[in-house]
Amino acid sequence: MSLLEVHGLKKVYTSRFGGQSVQALSNVNFSVEQGEYVAIMGESGSGKTTLLNILAALDRPTEGEVLLEGRSMSEIRESELAAYRRENLGFVFQDFNLLDTFSIRDNIFLPLVLSGKRYEQMNEKLAPIARKLGIEDILSKYPYEVSGGQKQRAAVARALITQPKIVLADEPTGALDSRASDDLLSLFDEINRTGQTILMVTHSVKAASHAFREIGRAHV
């Protein structure tokens, strides 16, 4: 059984005004195995973000099914979705999605706080991750006090701290300069070597080249 299975996904949006329909996804099929590093390639407007939103259970498909460890996401009640995402999925976004009023440490802690973890437990989980990502010295700083590369490392730490089954990365190098992008991609390589499954959405050929395999326009 694959870790993630996608069967016949279709997504159609209908405009509120005029009832015009736009098809964002059509018959998308693929699977991701435990420990794989997979890139979904495509230009802007090709449906990559729509697909990622469905995989993250932030949106529902018009047709088709997504299964994580054999469980269909369509079976999960709306009231359970937030907890399901926290427990199973890690997210890395292009624009970091860090809260400026929270320190780097507290930003990383946020999914654990929402899960009701104690402060001591959170610190125990953070220590090895911060060491691996090289962010021990910036934990007490705020997002506006650190570089873009450091912000993205903090975002990666937040994604990893819940020990997710899969990390979903949406254009993770999009807001970074060339050097910071290279550093982040090397970091993803290292994280993947520990067994972490990564699914990355990108339009960058260079970023996609770090993955085991690519899923391109023929599928998305």
Predicted region positions:
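Conserved small/polar residues in nucleotide/adenosyl-binding loops
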Residues: 218-220
